[in-house]
Amino acid sequence: IEYVNKVPDDYVEFSSDLNFAYSGAHDDGPVFKAEVMEDKWDMYVYGERLYISRSWTGKLCFVAHCEFKSDHVEIHRISADSEFVSGDLRHAGRVVDFLIKSHMSNMVVPHPLPARLREEPADEIAAYSFEMFGRRGLFGSFDETIGILGEQG
């Protein structure tokens, strides 16, 4: 409840065209809670918003403004803490897409890598991946990741 009607500190807001399959019913409250330290995110739905926060600090990082339909959810707008944008609004959208797929749907999909890491050594990329996505960040991609359908984990 602490996040209701809040946005991340130092946020940017941008439009989105994300959509996901949906059962048609939900209750307000947590939709994903970290079970172990290697889970890096918590996710809550209140009203028409999905709040995504860092699990161990509670820092609110993303708010996805949702439109719940009978069989899918559309996300038309995202508010993101500028720290997670990496100078690329599309990248921030990819992060939200990955978090929904990997955490709420338990899918195995590639996580997005920011362009700034393209020239970095593999160990730097691996460190970023673990810090950002923990045990769900199995493999990353610099390419477009929205639209990739994964396998159930």
Q: Where are the model-predicted features located?
A:
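Negatively charged, low-complexity tracts enriched in Asp/Glu with abundant Ser/Thr
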Residues: 1-47, 125-153
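A generic structural signal for short, non-catalytic loop/turn and secondary-structure boundary residues
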Residues: 36, 45, 57, 71-73
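Polybasic, proline/glycine-rich intrinsically disordered low-complexity segments
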Residues: 72-153
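Canonical SH2 domain fold
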Residues: 48-68, 77-78
